[in-house]
Amino acid sequence: MTTFNTISVIGAGAWGTALANACARAGRQVTLYGRSTDVLAAIAARGENPRLPGITLEKSIRVTHDLAESAKADALLLVTPTQSLREAMIALAPHVADATPLVICAKGIERGTRKFVTEIATEVLPQTRPAILSGPSFAADVARGLPTAVTLAAAEEPLAVALTHALGSSSLRPYHTTDVRGVEIGGAVKNVLAIAAGIAAGKALGASALAALTTRSFAELMRFGLACGAHRETIAGLSGLGDLILTCSSAQSRNFTFGMALGRGEAPPGSLSEGQSTAPVLIEIARAQAIEMPVAEAVANVLAGAITVNEGIEMLLARPFRAEG
């Protein structure tokens, strides 16, 4: 089996830093690339990223703002928001060697092109071997070494297996699959549905309503996934159902907290949630393929200003009675 002893994490935000810590804990030689010299200086001087306060990082992590140097690792983890992936990949392109594994750690669909994240990689970095890491995980939990399980997908099963062994440890448990599209869909779609869950929580509709909404959201996720070629077991697994449950039930999720602010009629948090960017393109795809997604469509319409939050709730509650499925 191929081993990946050196790993570079491209992106020194909370999630990138957490993954760097997990990889270092797994015994890999880790380089963490970031553009903010202040963040890198804090990590180098104090062993702590200001975006993960109170969490001590592994001393072996090396930080750098030299992208060319970072690209020399055996495997790369690309940890940037979906709408910035193309720009990051273009910057990486001159420096990445042929057949380098590129593990994308983003959840979304590119606006304008409707491309999933590995499709962007195939277009911009055709010399790499793309993979995707996704699942129910918060940066602080992973950084602290709390038990977390995720899914790692690559089209080549030997690559997926090798990466699983390279990144995995007693605290971070990756499960491998070749269903790349299924993992991409789970991560992208649940972000939009989590906004709906946050709205329900913000409107104080009750635990019963939140449970019903999450369940019906899963039905939408499954419909969309199967229509787009995902495997049923992937959508019902960690990167689908698992991630949906986590982000529909925790204020640690930016999508959930964004929805809560909408439900309360408050100004949304400053940081952009992936679901905000994904919602309109998700509905474009759903409409083009005649996939019924009333919850996701209500979210997209609220975000577009076409309807109010209350109107969206009323529309969902006024839908015709039907058989479950």
Swiss-Prot record:
Gene of this entry: gpsA
Protein name: Glycerol-3-phosphate dehydrogenase [NAD(P)+]
Gene Ontology annotations for the cellular component aspect, listed alphabetically: cytosol
Source organism (scientific name): Afipia carboxidovorans (strain ATCC 49405 / DSM 1227 / KCTC 32145 / OM5) (Oligotropha carboxidovorans)
Cell compartments where the protein resides: Cytoplasm
Binding site for NADPH: 15, 35, 107, 139, 254, 272, 274
Function per UniProt: Catalyzes the reduction of the glycolytic intermediate dihydroxyacetone phosphate (DHAP) to sn-glycerol 3-phosphate (G3P), the key precursor for phospholipid synthesis.
Keyword Lipid biosynthesis: yes
Principal location: cytoplasm
The UniProt record lists the keyword Nucleotidyltransferase: no
Enzymatic class: oxidoreductase
